[in-house]
Structure formats: C-alpha cells, structure tokens
C-alpha cells in the first residue's frame, strides 16, 4: 500500500544517513543509481527526500548503502516535497538558481506563453539532466536541461 509522509523530518533524517553512507563508501550518485532503471537526477532527488522510489529501485540503493528494511520502506513513501525552507536560499549553488529565476523568470513566462499559450510547465511530469562540457574559452560549463510537460490552463 502506498504511504505518505506528513512532515519532512523522517525523510530529512534518512537523507542524512544516505549522504553519510555515500561518503563512507566513497560512491557517486551515478554509482548508487546503477541498476535502478531510473535517471540519476530522479534517484538523487529521491535519496535527498524529494520523491518516492519504486520498490525495486529502493532495494537496489538500500543494498548499496547498507540501509535496513525500515529505511528501504521509507524511501518508498511519498514525501513532503520542497527542500528549501522559507526565504532566500543561502547555499551559493542553490542561490544561483534562485538568481536565474529572479533574472529570467519573467522572460521564461513570456516566452512559454507566447509559444504555448496560457498554462504552466509541469515539475511533476518532468525530466532533469545535467552535463559537464568543456568551455571553448577554458574551464567547464554546466548544461542543465529542464524538460517539463506543458499543461494548458483550462477554463471551467
């Protein structure tokens, strides 16, 4: 039976255990994800408390991280989503995404509405991909793809 959380505390505590096990075992999220049949972005979000994992995927990651049966079951529960507490984020990496939305949010909204009409881009029917590529000017660039289904507003 599908279970749902009523607060973030249990999944937050499990996320701490997962990060500790990942560090202790010197694993990457990609290595933990292998064999789940899911994207590394989805599995990582689940391990950090933002999605439930299917039973088979929960078994795979629990075995790799030496998590007990209770933790494996908790990974399958529907979490209370949203990992950033109220206010402006203070972590520099997360803040940059906040800054991107502050600078480009109205542009994204205008272009989405111009191309698709009145509606939203789903964060539920959604895919995320991150790639590291060489910058021709030196260093590296992060190519981040946000792929969400467009959902039109329906008059009623």
UniProtKB/Swiss-Prot annotation:
It is an enzyme of class 4 (lyase). GO terms for molecular function: cyanate hydratase activity; DNA binding. One of its GO terms (biological process) is cyanate metabolic process. Gene3D superfamilies: Cyanate lyase, C-terminal domain, lambda repressor-like DNA-binding domains. Keywords: Lyase. It catalyses: cyanate + hydrogencarbonate + 3 H(+) = NH4(+) + 2 CO2. The keyword Lyase applies. The active site is at residues 96, 99, 122. Signal peptide: none annotated. The keyword Lyase applies. SUPFAM superfamilies: Cyanase C-terminal domain, lambda repressor-like DNA-binding domains. Its EC number is 4.2.1.104. Pfam families: Cyanate_lyase, CYNS_N. Catalyzes the reaction of cyanate with bicarbonate to produce ammonia and carbon dioxide. Belongs to the cyanase family. This is Cyanate hydratase. The lineage of its organism: Bacteria, Pseudomonadati, Pseudomonadota, Betaproteobacteria, Burkholderiales.
């Amino acid at each position: 039976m599908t279970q749902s959380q009523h607060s973030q505390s249990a999944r937050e505590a499990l996320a701490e255990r997962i990060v500790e096990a990942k560090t202790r075992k010197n694993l990457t999220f990609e290595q933990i994800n292998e064999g789940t049949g899911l994207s590394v972005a989805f599995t990582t979000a689940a391990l950090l408390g933002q999605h439930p994992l299917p039973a088979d995927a929960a078994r795979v990651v629990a075995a790799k991280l030496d998590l007990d049966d209770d933790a494996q079951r908790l990974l399958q529960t529907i979490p209370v989503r949203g990992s950033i507490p109220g206010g402006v984020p203070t972590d520099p990496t997360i803040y940059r995404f906040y800054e991107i939305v502050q600078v480009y949010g109205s542009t994204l909204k205008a272009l989405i509405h111009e191309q698709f009409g009145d509606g939203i881009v789903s964060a539920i029917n959604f895919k995320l991909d991150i790639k590291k590529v060489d910058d021709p000017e030196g260093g590296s660039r992060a190519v981040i793809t946000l792929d969400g289904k467009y959902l039109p507003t329906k008059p009623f």
